[in-house]
């Protein structure tokens, strides 16, 4: 069965695979970032968003991977076999966890639509032959003007920011308007 964990987020595993393997930060750096930015949301009882749920699941997978590698390191006596297995785990499962953490952290940080646009534009850029493409790849950290950065905490964080409508103009004084008396020079 071919399951794409990014389909419900409007993306695909194929789009993430356009990014080079060294694009994704180290797993420990991603875990530290997730913990630093979203510890309350990840450890709390309340459901925040599908991205938070996916990060929780990726962190559980990462924890199980580290336990598996520790077990293999202590139980496999052949250094060569141990190295082959650890490298295979890091290159396959570790990469999938890195991709997942990067994707969901980026969606929470920059917005899902911005990440989607980045993946598509990078995919187009990388598939364009070198002589015909611009020299610089698209950059995710360059935010378009219309991107809304999410607010931290509270129930309002999940809603879009409130639009401010202009308030009606008020009179300068609250007392009824008085008619100005005309000056004597105005009568001339």
Curated annotation (Swiss-Prot):
Residues 150-181 have a biased composition (Basic residues). GO terms for biological process: microtubule-dependent intracellular transport of viral material towards nucleus; symbiont entry into host cell; viral penetration into host nucleus. The keyword Repeat applies. GO terms for cellular component: host cell; host cell cytoplasm; T=4 icosahedral viral capsid. Belongs to the orthohepadnavirus core antigen family. Homodimerizes, then multimerizes. Interacts with cytosol exposed regions of viral L glycoprotein present in the reticulum-to-Golgi compartment. Interacts with human FLNB. Phosphorylated form interacts with host importin alpha; this interaction depends on the exposure of the NLS, which itself depends upon genome maturation and/or phosphorylation of the capsid protein. Interacts with host NUP153. This is Capsid protein. It comes from Woodchuck hepatitis B virus (isolate 8) (WHV).
